């Protein structure tokens, strides 16, 4: 009897912007997929309850998450971060989906994420080089 191939399970963290105003919040949920290829084309569309994110009324609250970018998750083994756009059930862009309004042929738009890090002094518990008793004070 041939050896059974071990199933590899991947965690896909779907991320989207909710419908809160004036400032949208990031939302996410995780889908576990067996033997995922690691390619964007193999990320399935997924739905969520838009009434809890101010993107739909209670009676007809399904919204769709359309994967548009895929990145390896630096924190989780076999993990991926799936950036998505919010779509209506008919596949049209949701009104909160400002990304869909960007003209793909216009190369003047640049977007990026910024992550800040601090190296802490283990003795003073302050950022390295910060004067003890100096300013600014704790926030």
Could you describe each region identified by the protein language model?
Residues 1-139:
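Glycine-rich, acidic/polar active-site loops that bind/position phosphate-bearing ligands
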